[in-house]
């Protein structure tokens, strides 16, 4: 049996090794994990860019984001722009103009297994969630992600509406049934206004994941088309157009940009030029931009287009 002196010596050697490897002794700080989290926040590059871009088809919505990614000289080498590309507009535009391999165009649609419907709406919803979570995991591992563009957000609204009717309320068996909301066939109508909260909750799961990306220093852009909010066969009032997304979305996005195209004609009613513009309808990070309109592109008959883009998306203006 070892003597006490040997035991003490051995204990001293153990304590020396413990001190050298830096083993932490338990402490009574109940907020230790929060302090560590706060420390990690100081190393995150914050952009605070979360913008909604809306307008009619062909007004340059996706183009201004792709151009910003291409022109931003401050971005980290090998940075990636991910696109959740519902209408494949980002993929086609990148292929035709930029051909940038660091633009990743994700197809969010999951094909249906039956002949009756082309898409599996519940599977598509889950696939979108998985793509966003994957991007978050890449950022957390240190992969440089410049931004995420969700293109064709009106399709996401449709997916959430159909899943509410198919999965949550059991009013339809597939996407075709879900599209028939007349209540005339087997598919029933949504009976209570409160039921629409289910659709909205589904929709804003994407909001939650987008905010998580913004907190990690990633720019997030939502792009959608327009819809008429007062159409009536009996009413001659001017049509009121609004972005095609869940109606509370305007409250959740810090920046809103409306894209327009204005045509100019000559005395013979022939098209002379088209001016494409971006107008800020909301900007919490730079209120001086609100109601400002900036020219993005001008096309003139018989001439090459003049492209200006929207440098605000990468030069620090926002």
Task: Describe every region a protein language model picked out.
Residues 2-36, 43-51, 265-318:
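C-terminal regions of RecA-like/P-loop NTPase motor modules
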Residues 37-40, 60-63, 207-208, 243-244:
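A generic local structural motif
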Residues 41-143, 147-148, 158-162:
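Conserved P-loop
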Residues 45-48, 56, 68-77, 86, ...:
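Phosphate-handling catalytic cores of nucleic-acid transaction enzymes
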Residues 83, 151, 253:
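Residue-level signature of catalytic and energy-coupling elements of molecular machines
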Residues 107-112, 173-178, 244-248, 303-309:
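Glycine-rich loops and low-complexity Gly/Arg-rich segments
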Residues 144-248:
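P-loop NTPase motor core
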Residues 212-301:
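Phosphate-binding/switch region of NTP-binding enzymes
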